Amino acid sequence: MLPAQHKLNSSMQFRTVMRKGRRAGSKTVVVHLWDSAESLDGTEKQGEVASFGGPRFGLVVSKAVGNAVVRHRTSRRLRHICASIAEKSPELLSPTHHVVIRALAGAGNATSAELERDIRYGLGKASRVRTNK
């Protein structure tokens, strides 16, 4: 189970992460990653609340994934993966990171191991700092 302190709650938070964050995709998921410490200048902006209790996650599982049973099963798998990443992999995410995981159509047929591999790959790719040549 994903604790409440690790959940994105409002549509404004989802929108902020998806617009301002970096993204990386795979066959099953698209990972949007945003570090809230990058844009907060000491004043709290509406909808952009810094959370230092740990990384925060949000899930988007659309009807493209499958029927309600498949979507809920996929959501449960993704929540479990997010909880294990938040607890056991502090090197991947800092407490100021916000993550939105968007499940693609292939996520409904994927195993938990494939989903975890794709999420870790997406987090690693999205967290790399780009350098201009």
From Swiss-Prot:
GO CC entries: ribonuclease P complex
Catalytic activity: Endonucleolytic cleavage of RNA, removing 5'-extranucleotides from tRNA precursor
Keyword tags: Endonuclease, Hydrolase, Nuclease, RNA-binding, tRNA processing
Highest rank taxon of the organism: Bacteria
EC number of this enzyme: 3.1.26.5
Stored InterPro entries: Ribosomal_Su5_D2-typ_SF, Ribsml_uS5_D2-typ_fold_subgr, RNase_P
Annotated Pfam families: Ribonuclease_P
Biological process, per Gene Ontology: tRNA 5'-leader removal
Single GO molecular function: ribonuclease P activity
Top class in the EC scheme: hydrolase
Subunit structure: Consists of a catalytic RNA component (M1 or rnpB) and a protein subunit.
Family: Belongs to the RnpA family.
Purpose of the protein: RNaseP catalyzes the removal of the 5'-leader sequence from pre-tRNA to produce the mature 5'-terminus. It can also cleave other RNA substrates such as 4.5S RNA. The protein component plays an auxiliary but essential role in vivo by binding to the 5'-leader sequence and broadening the substrate specificity of the ribozyme.
Designated name of the protein: Ribonuclease P protein component
